[in-house]
Curated annotation (Swiss-Prot), chain A:
GO BP: ribosomal small subunit assembly; translation
Classification via Gene3D superfamilies: 30s Ribosomal Protein S19, Chain A
Keyword Signal: no
One Pfam family from the record: Ribosomal_S19
Cited function: Protein S19 forms a complex with S13 that binds strongly to the 16S ribosomal RNA.
Family designation: Belongs to the universal ribosomal protein uS19 family.
Protein's UniProt name: Small ribosomal subunit protein uS19
Amino acid sequence: MARSVWKGPFLDGYMLGKADKARASGRNEVIKIWSRRSTILPQFVGLTFGVYNGQKFIPVLVTENMIGHKFGEFSPTRTFYGHAVDKKAKRK
Amino acid sequence: MGPRVRVGVIVGVHGVRGAVRIKSFTEEPADIGYYSPMEDEAGGTKFRLKVTGEVKGLVIATLEGIADRNAAEALKGTGLWVPRERLPGRLAEDEFLYSDLIGLVVEAVDGKRLGTVKAVADYGAGDVLDIKLEPKGDMMVPFTKDSVPEVDIAGGRLVVVPPVYAPDENEERNGGA
């Protein structure tokens, strides 16, 4: 078995506790996290995390296709908005 | 004259036959060709544009009536504007153009004015509104029906439910950011 398989995905220990707490509360709260290096796990789907980018917390609503990625991927530290005038935003 | 949007700007010339390099502000850079004819900021000059290629993120195009490099160089820095109604009109339900959302007044559910939409961004986890709060500060809100229950483009406003952060015991340890 490859080393990366038996070690499992990396996750900062406190993340699971935070997610469980938020889910148990039943409120639609944003969970502030600083751990950009943690892997997104299936049990995070549906929760909204505020991922710190060194300046502010970017809201990240976790969906199924984000599993396996790191939180930091969705919270860029260098912001460039671009100028796309005809780009469409879909309200989910 | 109705509202207009800037779809590009001429940033340089290409070759000796009057072609120009354009920084396109459309989602797909080459799509700028579909908005021809365009006009300059004052609205006095019309440009008929034909896209001939792309290089280093810029669009190469020829302009009708511009046939030599000197004439093309004189246009450097010129913005290319089109009327707002020329942008895609058929949008699905709950679909909005970035350019329509930017600048909208942001109100709370109780009608209190919070600020204005500074920018819209998609970092891979859905669209996020960057709101400039009044008198200072900013707030990022996911563009979802829960967080943004009402969008009134015609009225120039949208209603936002500010995000509630879960209490965090480690916040002080992390610098209280």
